[in-house]
Structure formats: structure tokens, C-alpha cells
Amino acid sequence: MQWSRRNGTKQGKILIGDIDCFGLAIDHQRYLYISDVKQHEIRRYQLEGDMKNGTVIAGGNEEGSDVNQFDFPTFIFVDRYQNVYVSDWNNHRVMKWINGEKKGTIIAGGQGGGNALKQLSIPSGLFVDESDVLYVADLGNSRIMC
């Protein structure tokens, strides 16, 4: 859904329908990124273009734990280079997908769910600052990691 803050309307506009979206982000070039938890993928849409067919830019290879798969991708962060960071809930990891690559890199967690410093449990919100430091809301452990 999209709501314009300029005209004071309380009625939204459907941009993309029939999707199991959990997280979204918009980059500086006005691309919309969404996580589809049922399809286990991240798609990118041009906001000014055809919103019917997004491009799969990460995952989309069924549910799994390989570096080209997700198991319930949720929160997304997109950096200035259009690299995509994804919280992969059921794999208890955060992955980075370099723009244009077919496989991601595990940059946090991925050691099974747990509370050790190298583990995450249900990673949620995430942010990467200008110094490339990753911050993760580790929901299952009630903590913020960096």
C-alpha cells in the first residue's frame, strides 16, 4: 500500500498485490525491495515503472539454508551500492547479497539458533551504518548485536 503524505488522504493505493511481504526498503534510486516469506526471496521493483513484475535479486531457489536460499526472509537493508542485507529468520543468520550476485554471504549468525556471540536467534531488524557496521535486533535473545 502507498499513502501520500502530501494530499492528506487516508485511502491507500495498492502497489503490489497477492504477496506475502514482511519487510521492505527503498534505495536512493527509488527501487522498492520486498521480502516474500512464502517464496523465500527478495524482489526489486522500480517505483515509477511496472509494479506487476519484480526482479528476484536474492533467494528464489526454494526454502533452504544454502547461500543462494532463504528460510523465511524478513527485514531488509539496502546500502548505497545497492547491496542487500537480509534477516533470514529460520536459518538464524543475516546475509549480504552484493548487487548482481547470485549467491549471498553469511555475515552474522548461521551457526544454528543460540545465544553465543557467534549465534543469532530469530534475527529481526537490521541496519548498516556508514562505517559498514552491522546492527541486528536479535529477537530470540532479547538483545542488539553489532
Model-identified regions with their sequence ranges:
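Structural signal for beta-propeller blades
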Residues: 1, 40-43, 92-94, 142-144
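Gly/Pro-rich loop segments of beta-rich domains
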Residues: 7-22, 49-74, 100-124, 135
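Conserved beta-propeller blade signature
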Residues: 31-34, 84-85, 134-135
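Loop/turn-rich, solvent-exposed surfaces of beta-rich toroidal or solenoidal domains
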Residues: 93, 117-146
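Short loop/turn segments immediately following the C-termini of beta-strands
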Residues: 37, 81, 89, 99, ...
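Hydrophobic/aromatic beta-strand positions that recur at structurally equivalent sites within the blades
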Residues: 2-5, 45-47, 97
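Residue-level detector of Asp-centered blade-edge/turn motifs that repeat once per structural unit
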Residues: 26-29, 78-81, 128-131
